[in-house]
């Protein structure tokens, strides 16, 4: 029997960093997704949005306060935007075939997790369009097999190289170890 697993559907950004208005990112592949593009194309902001909605504090996003996530281009200088919001849509899937794209969405499994950043530096989580605590969001995701305490979710820029070097370093230690 095939197991159910969670899959990101689109990620929706509202007034988040370089994204004014509403922007939809995705959909994401069920097994593996990466964010690639030229310098300055917003890759880091997409990852920051994911980190934000999954509970990272402003300092972890290289910011002093959460209100710095709110889009602030010159176009909004006279009338600053009051909030930024990131919403991640999930659904559960069941593999149906041999191919990577052969799956069915489990009926009724769709849910949205959101986090809102306000100008007063407060933030609010939502689980299924209802206000929630971070603890409730983390418990829900944990029940679906997504562990937010695991530092491998997601793997960030620079970490891929570090991970690949671990194997090289261990191999060098092995080959350079004295033999008995």
Indicate where each model-derived feature is located.
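Gly/Lys-enriched N-terminal cap/neck module of very large, oligomeric protein machines
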Residues: 8-180
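Charged, amphipathic alpha-helical linker segments immediately N-terminal to NTP-binding catalytic cores
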Residues: 1-9
């Amino acid at each position: 029997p095939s197991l159910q697993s969670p899959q990101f559907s689109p990620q929706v950004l509202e007034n988040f960093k370089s994204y004014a208005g509403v922007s939809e990112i995705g959909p994401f592949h069920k097994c593996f997704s990466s964010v690639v593009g030229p310098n300055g194309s917003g890759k880091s902001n997409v990852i920051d949005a994911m980190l934000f909605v999954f509970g990272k504090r402003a300092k972890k996003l290289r910011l002093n306060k959460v209100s710095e996530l709110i889009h602030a281009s010159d176009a909004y200088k006279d009338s600053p935007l009051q909030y930024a919001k990131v919403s991640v849509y999930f659904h559960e899937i069941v593999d149906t075939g041999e191919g990577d794209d052969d799956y069915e969405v489990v009926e009724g499994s769709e849910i949205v997790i959101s986090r809102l950043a306000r100008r007063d530096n407060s933030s609010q989580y939502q689980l299924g369009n209802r206000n929630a605590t971070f603890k409730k969001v983390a418990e829900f995701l944990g029940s679906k097999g997504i562990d937010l305490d695991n530092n491998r979710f997601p793997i960030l820029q620079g970490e891929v190289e570090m991970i690949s070097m671990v194997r090289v370093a261990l191999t060098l230690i092995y080959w350079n170890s004295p033999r008995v």
